């Protein structure tokens, strides 16, 4: 069995999604515009240019907001988010919705809204920006001759299926 991550491994989409969607949506949701430049630079460092590259969106959000809380602006209810990230069995919108029903936390509500807006923003990216790396299809085809190939991703399932389907990558898994 060969497991292949989607964003940043098969699909050349990781950078654009963080540059145009994840970080900017966080800045907007938490009204951080006055510190946008350093905050976005740090978001990209956490999610693209460090050992935490590819971390789940909610873990990346918790890391970034904890730093923002210390350096720029108090993030009300931050402990609700960090506690949920540390304790939940699933880092997903549906698990977050359940936690909101149980706690009513405003910070968790903002995190859910941010995540939903990220998905909307990703869906609005021009299709020319969501392509596989050169050679991805051929590499997957070669791997599939010798092993089962599976997609593993913390990215939105529907987006992964759409992106992989559009370029014929699903034919190899």
Where are these regions (language model features)?
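Short, hydrophobic/glycine-enriched beta-strand segments
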Residues: 1-10
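Alpha-helical substrate-recognition element adjacent to the catalytic core
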Residues: 9-161
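Extended hydrophobic/aromatic segments used for targeting, binding, or gating
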Residues: 161-173
């Amino acid at each position: 069995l060969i497991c292949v991550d989607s964003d940043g491994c098969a699909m050349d989409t990781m950078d654009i999604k963080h540059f145009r969607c994840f970080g900017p949506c966080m800045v907007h949701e938490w009204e951080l515009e006055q510190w946008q430049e350093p905050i976005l630079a740090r978001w990209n460092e956490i999610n693209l240019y460090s050992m935490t590259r590819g971390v789940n969106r909610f873990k990346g959000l918790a890391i970034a907001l904890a730093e923002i809380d210390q350096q720029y602006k108090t993030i009300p209810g931050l402990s609700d988010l960090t506690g949920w990230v540390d304790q939940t069995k699933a880092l997903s919108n549906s698990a977050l919705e359940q936690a909101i029903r149980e706690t009513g936390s405003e910070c968790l509500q903002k995190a859910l809204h941010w995540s939903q807006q990220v998905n909307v923003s990703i869906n609005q990216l021009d299709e020319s920006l969501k392509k596989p790396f050169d050679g991805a299809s051929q590499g997957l085809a070669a791997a599939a001759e010798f092993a089962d190939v599976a997609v593993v991703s913390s990215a939105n399932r529907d987006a992964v299926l759409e992106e992989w389907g559009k370029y014929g990558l699903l034919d190899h898994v």
